[in-house]
Structure formats: C-alpha cells, structure tokens
UniProtKB/Swiss-Prot annotation:
<dbReference type="InterPro" id="IPR029063">
    <property type="entry name" value="SAM-dependent_MTases_sf"/>
</dbReference>
<keyword id="KW-0698">rRNA processing</keyword>
<dbReference type="GO" id="GO:0005829">
    <property type="term" value="C:cytosol"/>
</dbReference>
<feature type="binding site">
    <location>
        <position position="83"/>
    </location>
    <ligand>
        <name>S-adenosyl-L-methionine</name>
    </ligand>
</feature>
<dbReference type="InterPro" id="IPR003682">
    <property type="entry name" value="rRNA_ssu_MeTfrase_G"/>
</dbReference>
<feature type="region of interest" description="Disordered">
    <location>
        <begin position="218"/>
        <end position="240"/>
    </location>
</feature>
<dbReference type="GO" id="GO:0070043">
    <property type="term" value="F:rRNA (guanine-N7-)-methyltransferase activity"/>
</dbReference>
<keyword id="KW-0949">S-adenosyl-L-methionine</keyword>
<keyword id="KW-0489">Methyltransferase</keyword>
<feature type="binding site">
    <location>
        <position position="147"/>
    </location>
    <ligand>
        <name>S-adenosyl-L-methionine</name>
    </ligand>
</feature>
<keyword id="KW-0963">Cytoplasm</keyword>
<feature type="binding site">
    <location>
        <begin position="129"/>
        <end position="130"/>
    </location>
    <ligand>
        <name>S-adenosyl-L-methionine</name>
    </ligand>
</feature>
<comment type="similarity">
    <text>Belongs to the methyltransferase superfamily. RNA methyltransferase RsmG family.</text>
</comment>
<dbReference type="Pfam" id="PF02527">
    <property type="entry name" value="GidB"/>
</dbReference>
<keyword id="KW-0808">Transferase</keyword>
<feature type="binding site">
    <location>
        <position position="78"/>
    </location>
    <ligand>
        <name>S-adenosyl-L-methionine</name>
    </ligand>
</feature>
<protein>
    <recommendedName>
        <fullName>Ribosomal RNA small subunit methyltransferase G</fullName>
        <ecNumber>2.1.1.-</ecNumber>
    </recommendedName>
</protein>
Length: 240
C-alpha cells in the first residue's frame, strides 16, 4: 500500500473521505517536499510512508477533536514546511490560512507549494512571531496553531496575542504536554487565556504519543506582549 492509499484508509476510519483531487494534492505535496528538501532543510523525514504518517496524518489529527469544517481564519506559527495548516487546508478547503515563519527560504517553498496545489485563501509571511503579534493582525484569528515549535511557556506568548477574544490557541505537542501545561498556566492567564481541553492519543503503528492542548482566549492581551524577539524564549513567563 502506498502513502496516499494508507492515508486515505486511516482518515476514512475517522469519517474523512479524501476526493481524487485531495489525493493528488497530497501526492504533489510529498513530491515537492522531497525535491525542495535536497536544497534546503525542510524535514529530516523523507521516506514516503513516514511523511504520510508523521507529517500529513499527524497534522490532520486535530480535526478528530476540533471542528475545522467551517470558514475559520487560522494562523500557523513556525509551520516550517506547512505543518499542520497545509494538510488541514487540503482536507478543509474553506479554511483561511496564514503561516508566519522566520526563515524566508521556507516561505518561498510554501508559496511554490500553494501555487502547485491550487490553494486559495492562503498567505505566507516572513516574520518573527513576536513582531507579527504586534502588528495589524494582532487578535484577528479564530484559531492559532503551533506544532512542536517550543515549550508551551514560550508558545503561549507567541500565539495568544494573535488569537481574537473568543478564539482558541491549539498547541500540538508530543508527550510531556501536561507537564508543560502546568508550567505555562501562569503565562497563559497573564496573556488572557484559560485552559479549555487536552487530548492525548497515539499515532498509528506505535509512531508516538501526541497531545493537543486547547486554550480559550477570554480577555484581550496586554499591549506589552509579545515582548521583543528572543525574549519569550530567554525568559518565559513563569510564576516566581
């Protein structure tokens, strides 16, 4: 069974039926990822089955627990080669996706990828999340996602300022999410967020444990956050 057949079968078990067009989009995504990866570091995973399992399937797992089948505005922080937002966009074409990444080479790849996949309502921004979160897009997104970018204490300060009041920040972590959540509660509260839900599950074929943490944005974030680039990582918001 090749990668796309495997993905279609696994998603079908969760009530997601891929059309022929969507299958073609994933196959093109895989081909371009491997091609571009030869000239820039997009991923350490290039084996076909591994990409379909650990990148494509893994990116779509949030939709097993959260309704993405609606015209949400999504900002994906530090998405690298487009994970999780581009696989989600392929499955749920109504999503309006913005990706912010600090490396211009990755933005070039994403622009080429979106054109080849025929995606609309996607935009790719070359910026640091700390700077982007201070600009006109602050507090405008229904959902902000981040997948394995940094510890939750840091991620909260990068992502929550972008979430509009009433929206959600969805952090996708491997194991240790609960431990990170405990450490991040203080900062989440300062930034206007409240813990809502977390889901722990295993990827197929013993490919590892995953955690999805959902934070509700209840209040506007103080204008002093996010702090200047590098500060959230150097001195995260922790209870003294």
């Amino acid at each position: 069974m090749n990668g796309i057949e495997w993905l279609a079968k696994e998603l079908s078990e969760h009530g997601i039926e891929l059309s022929d067009k969507q299958k073609e989009q994933f196959q093109t995504y895989y081909r371009l990822l491997v091609e571009w990866n030869e000239k820039m570091n997009l991923t350490s995973i290039t084996d076909e089955h591994e990409v379909y399992l650990k990148h494509f399937y893994d990116s779509i797992t949030p939709s097993f627990y959260y309704d993405f089948n609606q015209p949400l505005t999504i900002c994906d922080v530090g998405a690298g080669a487009g994970f999780p937002s581009i696989p989600l966009k392929v499955v749920y074409p109504e999503l309006k996706v913005t990706i912010v990444d600090s490396l211009n080479k990755r933005i070039q790849f994403l622009n080429h990828l979106a054109a080849e996949l025929g995606l609309t309502q996607v935009s790719f921004v070359h910026d640091r999340a700390e700077t982007f979160g201070k600009g006109v897009n602050r507090e405008t997104y229904d959902v902000v996602t981040a997948r394995a970018v940094a510890r939750l204490t840091v991620l909260s300060e990068l992502c929550l300022p972008l979430v509009k009041k009433g929206g959600q920040f969805i952090a996708l972590k491997s194991s240790k999410g609960e431990e990170e959540l405990e450490e991040a509660q203080f900062g989440i509260s300062i930034l206007g967020g409240v813990f809502s839900d977390s889901y722990t599950f295993d990827l197929p074929e013993d490919a590892g444990e995953r955690q999805m943490i959902i934070i509700d944005k209840r209040r506007q974030t103080s204008k002093k956050y996010p702090r200047k680039p590098g500060t959230p990582n150097k001195s995260p918001l922790l209870e003294n």
